[in-house]
Structures are given as C-alpha cells and as structure tokens.
Design a protein with these regions (language model features):
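N-terminal, polar/Ser/Thr-rich
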Residues: 1-39, 47, 65, 117-124, ...
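Extended, low-hydrophobicity, Ser/Thr/Pro/Gly-biased non-transmembrane segments
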Residues: 17, 102-204, 227, 370, ...
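Surface-exposed beta-strand/loop patches in extracellular or lumenal glycoproteins
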Residues: 43-61, 142, 151-155, 424, ...
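Aromatic/His-enriched, Gly/Pro-containing loop or helix-boundary segments
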Residues: 54, 73-91, 128-135, 276-295
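A surface-exposed beta-strand-loop module
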Residues: 55, 60-118, 139, 519-531
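Beta-strand-rich binding/interaction modules
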Residues: 63-70, 438-439, 449-538
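Hydrophobic alpha-helical and helix-loop surface patches within well-folded domains
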Residues: 178, 208-209, 213-482, 617, ...
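Long, ordered, helix-rich scaffold segments
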Residues: 463-466, 505-506, 524-858
C-alpha cells in the first residue's frame, strides 16, 4: 500500500496522462477559533490524454463526503483509500472532478496549521505545503509538474484577514473570493488567515508598482521593524530584476511572519511565510539581522527560480534551493548600498560548514540526488541540497564568468516561464552563453558524492624564493555505507599570498587564479617570488573543497589568525581549523587555544558567534573525557573575561553574555547569572532583556538552581508563545529523574504537543552536563523510535528521531546499540538515514576524543 507516499514512476505516469487546467477551492474556516475540522470543496478541471484511463488524486482528510467525476457520483468507500481517490474511466480531453471533504487543522506545521496566541487567545492559521501537504487542505495532484491556476474562496470569522497568492479582495459577508493565480505548482499555493497585524507599502520602478505587505500577530506588532524589512525587500527587487532581466512575475508580494514554523521560510508565490522568531523581541547582534535579510532575499529569489520556473521532479530540488541560496548571498555582497557586503564571509563561515559536515556523513549523496519518492525528498532538505549546491554554483560562476552566468539565467527564465524544467535546460542555456561544455563539469560536480582536499606542496631555494608551488588534490574515501566512488574534480580556485606588514597585519600581496585538474596542478609563479608568510589555497572561496595549510603557513596562522585585514581569509582559516578538529587532525585542546589566541581580534560578529558554538561542541563532544571538565572551565573563564572586557552595549558583549550563559558552571559563575537575572548585579551596557533572561533561566534550571515554581514565575513575566517555549525547555532541562521522565513522556508517549513545544522540550532534555542522568534513555530511545516514526507526521517524527538520539553518549556501546537496532528494526530508508547520520556523529566524536587524548600524552 502506498500510504501517503508517491513514487517518481507514479508521478511520471500521471504527468504523461494529465494536463491540469484549474482548481476552484472553497474552504469554510468559520469555526477555526474552536479548531477540529473544516469543510473543503475542490473542483478541478483537467485533460486526459487517453479515453478510459485511470489515475488518482491525492487527499489527506479525516472524512470524504462526496466525489463526483464528470457529473457522476462515485462511491466514496470504494474510491478513497490510502490518502488517494481513484479516478477511473476518464474521458479523452476535458474532465471535471468535485471532492467534498472535512480536512483537519494541524499543530505540526504541515498542511493548515492552527495556533492560538496566549496573549489574545485568538487563533491564527497558515499553510505549509512543501513537499506534499496541499493534499491536507484540498484534493490535489500533488507533484510539481502538474501546474494549474488556483482560485480560492474562503469563509472566515468576522474581523479576520485572509491572504493568499492572489491580491486580497474585499470580503462580502466574511467570504473572501480571490482571483485565479497564474499557473503554479500545488506546493507553492498558500492561505494565511487570522486577525493579523499588517503594514503595507509598494515597490516602484519605471512605472512598475508591486504592492508589498508585512504581517505578524498583534502581540508582536510593537517589535515589527517593517522599514528594515521593506528596505531589504526593495534591494532584492532592484538587484534580482536587473540580473534576471525578467519582471517580478506575480501581482503582489506579501511576507507573513507566522508562529510555530518548522523551517526558516517558504516561497509561496506572492505570499511568503517566515518564522516569526525573525521579529526580534529583544536585542540581537547584527549577525541575526544579516540572517533574516538572507532569508528574505532567498525567498524573493525563489519567485523566479522555483515559482516562475519550477523543477519537473524533486531530484532537482537542489537547483531550487542552491540557486536561491547563491542569489541571496550574491545580492547581499554586490547590491549597491548593501549593509552586508561581507556576506561571502558569512557563507564560508556558516553555510559551507554545514555542507562539509553533511558531505562526510554516510548519507552523503550527489548534489543531484536520486529521489525515488516523497520519503526520499523529505529528508533531503540538507546541507548538500542548499549549501554545497550553492558553493558549486559559485564555482560554476567562476568557471563560466559572472556576466555569462546571468545572461544564461535570463534566457532560461524567458524560455520556461510558468513551466517546468530539468537541470539540462539550465546547463544548456549556460553552455550557449559561456561557450563552455558543461557536461563533464556536471558529471564531476553534480552526479558524484564527497569532498576533495586541496594541499599546497611548496619548494624554495636557498634565497627564500619559491621554485615551485603545486596544488595536490585528494579524493578521500567516502564514509562507510555511502554510495559512489571518490572523485577528483576540476576546481577553479585562487591562490592567495599573504605577508605581515609593518603593523603586524596579514595582507594579501599576490593572487593567482587557475584551473586545478587531476592530482597535481602546478601554479604559474612570477619570477623571483619570495616565499610568502601564508599560502592560502581557495582564496576568495571560489570552490568547494577542504583546504589544508603547509607547515610554515599553519605556524604563522596559528600565531596571527586574527591579524588578516580581510574577514574572508580569516573565515577560511577558522573553517580549516574547525574541519581539522572534527577530523582529529587538530586536538580539541589545541583548537581551544587557537580560538582563545585569535578571537579577541575577530571583528566579524557572525564568525565570533560560530566560534562560540564550535568551541562548546568541540569541548563537549571531541575532548578526551578526562580533560573535558578542565577544557570547559578554561572556556567558561574566557567567556566571562571577554564579557567583562567587551565594549558596553556592543554586539560582542551580547554574544559573550550568551556564550557565558551557555556554559557557566562553578558556584561563583552561577551566582553571577542569578545576580544578573535578579538585577542585584549589573555589567555596564548589558541589557538583561527578555531573551537574555531566558538564556540565564535555562542555564540555572539545568544546574538545579531554579525549581518549577521559579520557572513558572519567569513565565508569568513573559506570558507569550515564546515564553511558553522557553519555560518548557527550562522545565525539561532540570537535572532530576522526574523532570526527564516528564519531558520524555510528553514527547514520546504522547502526541499532544505542537511542533514548537515538542522542539523546545527536546532541546531542554538533552543537556551535555547530564550524561549520566540521560544514560537510561538510550535503551528507551531504540525501543520507541520506530513506533514513533510510523505513528507521527514526518516533521514531528524527525524532531524525535534526531533530537532524542543518544548523541551525548559517546561510546562504542552506543554504536553497538545503534547497529543492533538498524539490523533488527529494519527501518525505512528515511529513518535509517537519520539514525545512521546520528551514529556517524558518535563515531566521529570517538575518533576526535582519541586524537585529543593522544595529544595530551605526546
């Protein structure tokens, strides 16, 4: 039985048979305040290529009342099964189907999500349909290449606003009748409804006027910095329309900040939904504003790449996400007046770290993954699909040229507007504009898995001049269990030479760009080139590879990493050091010392915050267990020293306060947290606002210094959805058997928690200082996880499978327990992948711990 799955072969056959014309969808949401179910009436008109053919339409609904095909009533009990409605005896040419059903509101962030704000006790609704969840709201042919027009008619409670892909009409008797959309895929249709707060503006250029809207719940309205959001949006419109040479393809552009959102945002055509944590209630660093801007630009880029032109099947999901990721960073880097021209530093520091991690898991896969069915795609929103793909697009731009790249993209949009494509369509357009044959490039980069390592091999003469510089390329074996073979790839890279100037700064003195092919590539050198202090391969981060430094360069970088005048080479060196730590080539204790020696000079706040996270992870997971507490003590003392030394009111001060709160451990340190929380002690310039208070509360709760009553009192100060999440995490973090048992039961033994609260409880439950307390839950996890996977929706089950895996129990016993479960449980491919990825993390941590222990005895 197919259940809720859909195979590629089924989708191909349905696309061969059908051409879908239009949907008319009538939804009665008048009872949304109470919840439960709602009436959904779908009328869909489509053509069949054959007379008498048979197919199906998708629907996930508690009850189906009527199914009528070409005027004939079908027996519901016979045709509705396994989330499908069987459609037999189709006419050649035009057909019309009408389905009347009761669909369910959800609390999982899939389908039509319903949330009640504790501040005003009003219900707020929004849809999330990618990948296969439009069928939870209306009967649909749920695949991206069966595009159609969509006309929504919605009955809603009085006083509500309803937003969809088309411009919002004036309601008549609380009924909102929208105009049909252009031809789009089911997964980018949308409906958002509730008493939302709205701010409106326009984007205007050369006679073009695009209405803009920003929405959030009224309880967040005081924090909504609409002017900043509109400014980023207009920057995106300006840059994308110029680079794509195609006007914005929809009638308006709304951005809706919605609660309990599982992802960062979703590119619904003209009605983008964004997690409302991006409406900042408290002070955040500029890095948070940069991430929000990147999210806004990412979704806006999708209006062209993904919505206007859409992949035929989910194996090209990477192209959607990689292009939007590349475009978001490029816009921030190159748009006139951008606030974040250093965005490629952020990309190297965060997105590529994600990609490198993902690419070294047993689940590594080619960028163009083999997506056999919906189960495959649901676990494929990963670091390869987004970050590696975007890195490779950046490499492609370096390979064909920026102007040639965008000229090809322009031709691609014009040729395929409102249609569906495959990768070959884009590559063909780029081949025409660049003159490059991209077939071999595509095979090496898009159809193989794994990551290359680039090392310099340097020879000098007695006078200190370079006599040769060779780039040595390696293709390490793929992780155990991964499919494919190691592959050497063509790389377009820059080699940077850096020297110390008279003021002790590392400045670039030369840059050589070249194509790297095969195992060894000689770098052409100017005559009499002195050996530079640092030779940096992949300078400017043009390619996707792990980079290693030669011994002399590593020695200089270890002493002067913070002295690079530019942020990108610093980020590349930081990334290399982190990668070496994860690989066991650099001991955790040495990585800690490297960070402590250079972080004070790091001006990029995003890099600083990444280093905070990486050091904490390294000492928690990669340090030899007998040294771990000493390492944590050294790190915590450093965080407090930097907090006290930071400029009052600065981003760095806030970042160090959060780093200190994440790891405070001694009685004196915890007393300081308590005093800062109570206001009996202050640090000049540090505003202990709502979100920082919760960071302190969670650490104090995890340390056993706040009880249930005190957590409840903090929640009374912040009776909001965010406060509810923080309180749930704090309760689960308490170091008692009772707290852990209650948290476990609420997530694993009950399915009542909404997605966001479940996520919070899981994050509170898994405290790295509580390994012994959590040890009994290893056995409980393996006893429960398959049943959870089978019973819950994908999002909820994935949270549990990943979040509650015993990753903190770094031991051979955990590996053995995992292997035994994989052998006996016979999980489906998606669950097997998630558990295998977590197992790989434990295996890596064991190797890193051994390397750290060996360094101590060396």
């Amino acid at each position: 039985m197919p259940g809720t799955n859909l195979t590629r072969e089924e989708a191909q056959e349905r696309a061969r048979l059908l051409t879908v014309d239009a949907y008319e969808i009538d939804l009665d949401l008048s009872g949304a305040q109470e919840g439960g179910t709602y009436r959904s009436v779908t009328t869909v008109r489509f053509d069949s290529a054959e007379d008498g053919a048979e197919t199906f339409i998708d629907l996930v609904a508690p009850a189906v009342h009527d199914v009528e095909l070409n005027g004939k009533a079908l027996d519901v009990a016979s045709v509705f099964r396994d989330s499908r409605i069987a459609l037999k005896h189709l006419r050649a040419g035009a057909n019309e189907l009408k389905v009347v059903a009761d669909c369910a509101y959800t609390n999982t962030g899939e389908g039509l999500h319903r949330f009640v704000d504790p501040v005003d006790e009003q219900a707020y609704l929004y849809t999330q349909f990618e990948v296969p969840d439009a069928r939870r709201v209306f009967a649909s042919f749920e695949q991206p290449d069966l595009k159609a027009t969509f006309r929504f008619t919605v009955k809603a409670p009085a006083g509500w606003t309803v937003i969809s892909n088309s411009p919002t009409p004036e309601p008549v008797d609380d009924v909102w009748s929208f105009e049909p959309t252009p031809r789009i895929s089911t997964y980018i249709t949308a409906l958002i409804a509730g008493p939302y707060h709205a701010v409106h503006s326009t984007y205007e250029k050369d006679g073009q006027v695009v209405p803009l809207g920003i929405y959030c719940r009224p309880s967040l309205a005081e924090y909504l910095d609409a002017d900043d959001i509109f400014a980023v949006t207009r920057q995106g419109f300006e840059w994308f329309q110029e680079k794509f040479d195609y006007p914005y393809p929809f009638a308006k552009y709304d951005q809706l900040f919605v609660p309990e959102f599982n992802a960062g945002a979703m590119e619904n055509a003209g009605a983008v939904t964004i997690r409302d944590q991006y409406v900042f209630r408290s002070k955040v660093t500029d890095a948070s504003y940069e991430v929000r801007a990147a999210t806004i630009l990412h979704e806006l880029a999708h209006m062209w790449f993904g919505d206007l032109v859409t992949m035929e099947w989910w194996n090209d999901l990477w192209l959607n996400e990689s292009f939007a990721t590349f475009a978001e960073v490029a816009c921030q880097a190159y748009a006139e007046g951008s606030r974040w021209p250093h965005s490629w530093t952020t990309f190297a520091n965060s997105m590529k770290t994600w990609a490198y991690r993902q690419d070294q898991l047993p689940s590594t896969h080619p960028i163009m993954a083999d997506i056999r069915d919906l189960d495959d795609v649901l676990v494929n929103f990963d670091g390869i699909t987004y970050a590696k793909g975007a890195s490779v697009l950046k490499q492609l731009v370096a390979y064909v040229g920026m102007d040639e790249f965008f000229t090809g993209v322009q031709a691609y949009f014009k040729a395929h507007a409102y249609g569906n494509t495959r990768l070959a369509d884009l590559l063909g357009a780029l081949e025409k504009t660049s003159g490059r044959d991209l077939k071999a490039w595509s095979k090496a980069w898009l159809e193989t898995a794994g990551i290359n390592v680039l090392r310099p091999e340097i020879e000098t003469d007695g006078a200190g001049h370079l006599t040769s510089l060779t780039v040595v390329q390696e293709a390490p074996a793929l992780p155990a269990g991964a499919k494919g073979e190691p592959t050497l790839r063509p790389h377009r890279i820059a080699v940077g030479f850096y020297d110390l100037d008279g003021e002790g700064h590392l400045v670039r003195t030369n840059r050589i760009e070249l194509d790297v092919e095969g195992e060894r590539t000689a770098v052409p050198l100017p005559a009499d080139t002195a050996r530079p202090a640092v030779v940096l391969l992949n300078d400017d981060d043009l390619s996707y590879a792990k980079v290693r430094l030669d011994e002399d360069s590593l020695r200089v970088v270890t002493e002067h990493l913070g002295d690079f005048t530019e942020s990108l080479p610093r980020a590349l060196c930081w990334a290399s050091a982190w990668d070496m730590t994860r690989d066991g080539e650099l001991a955790t204790r040495d990585y800690l010392e490297l960070v402590l020696s250079g972080i004070a000079k790091e001006s990029d706040i995003g890099v600083v915050q990444s280093l905070h996270r990486q050091v904490k992870l390294a000492v928690d997971q990669y340090a030899a267990p007998e040294w771990r507490e000493a390492g944590l003590t050294r790190w915590t003392e450093a965080t407090l020293a930097h907090l006290r030394a930071a400029e009052p009111g600065s981003d760095h001060q806030l970042a160090w306060a959060r780093a200190f709160a994440a790891t405070a451990r001694t009685p004196l340190q915890l007393d300081l947290l308590q005093a800062l929380l109570n206001g009996t002690e202050e640090i000049e310039g540090l505003a202990v606002d709502t979100e920082l208070r919760w960071a302190f509360v969670q650490r104090l709760a995890a340390s056993g210094l706040l009880d249930e009553e005190e957590i409840a009192a903090e929640y009374e100060r912040d009776r909001t959805a965010a406060g509810e999440r923080h309180a749930a995490a704090a309760r689960a973090a308490q170091p008692s058997e009772a707290a852990k048992a209650e948290a476990w039961a609420s997530v694993v033994e009950s399915d009542k928690l909404p997605n966001s609260l479940q996520e919070s409880v899981i994050s509170g439950f898994t405290q790295s200082d509580q390994r012994e307390l959590l040890a009994p839950y290893t056995e409980k996890f393996f006893a429960a996880v398959k049943d959870v996977w089978d019973a819950r929706s994908h999002e909820m089950a994935q949270q549990i499978a990943v979040g509650l895996y015993p990753a903190l129990q770094v031991s051979q016993a955990t590996l053995d327990a995992t292997d035994a479960w994989l052998e006996s449980a016979r999980p489906n491919a998606a669950l097997r992948r998630l558990i295998s990825e977590s197992r790989s993390g434990v295996e890596r941590a064991l190797r890193a711990q051994a390397a750290d222990a060996a360094a101590a005895s060396a």
